Regions:
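Basic, flexible linker segments flanking DNA-binding modules
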Residues: 1-9, 105, 160-167
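Conserved, non-catalytic sequence blocks in retroelement Pol enzymes and Pol-derived host proteins
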Residues: 5-7, 23-24, 78, 105-108, ...
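Active-site beta-loop-alpha junctions of metal-dependent nucleic acid enzymes
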Residues: 26, 45-67, 83
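RNase H-like two-metal-ion nuclease catalytic core shared by retroviral integrases
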Residues: 76-78, 84-85, 100-120, 136-139, ...
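C-terminal domain-tail junction helix/linker
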Residues: 92, 96, 118-168
Length: 168
């Protein structure tokens, strides 16, 4: 993507990444896909281990939910999940064009990282999560809030409201 994070329509450019959510049981890993058109979280999955399947299942969930065209670019960092043959094969089978950050350059995936910063600042760091199940519930509620109720500064709308304007 060469840091060109502007999308003119839904499902043109997605970014993906994994972050960890601390709980008393250990870390819960959260994989998300964010649409750069409206900043909505298209799909997300959680797991107690950071595996290739966590990422693959997130892509599958996004594919079930959204229309994927050959124009779609999916940007990630160079984590082992995103450089795996399984990831390459799945994105190719869906007609998704892969894009990756340059090695050692976190700014290339800034918009995926930005969502995790918002999630942790507004939600996760305010509570002490006791369990994986509690963390999953909190993440579910926050992502619903983020997509459907949280106003984006740039558009003055929620991600879903902004997306509906394109479809209308």
């Amino acid at each position: 993507m060469n840091r060109d994070f502007k999308a003119d329509r839904p499902n043109q450019k997605w970014v993906t990444d994994i972050s960890y959510i601390p709980t008393k049981q250990g870390f819960l890993y959260l994989s998300v896909i964010r649409d750069l058109y409206d900043n909505s979280i298209i799909a997300y999955k959680t797991a107690t281990q950071q595996t290739i399947n966590l990422v693959l299942n997130t892509i599958r969930a996004a594919k079930r939910k959204e229309k994927v065209t050959e124009e779609l670019q999916l940007h990630s960092d160079q984590g082992f999940q995103y450089t795996s043959l399984a990831y390459f094969n799945l994105t190719q089978s869906y007609g998704i064009t892969q894009s990756m950050s340059r090695r050692g350059n976190p700014y290339d995936n800034a918009l995926a990282e930005n969502f995790f910063s918002i999630l942790k600042t507004e939600c996760i760091h305010r509570i002490k999560l006791q369990s994986f199940n509690e963390a999953r519930k909190v993440i579910d509620e926050y992502i619903y809030f983020y997509n459907n109720q949280r106003i984006q500064l740039k558009t003055k709308l929620t991600p879903i409201e902004y997306r509906r304007q394109y479809v209308a």
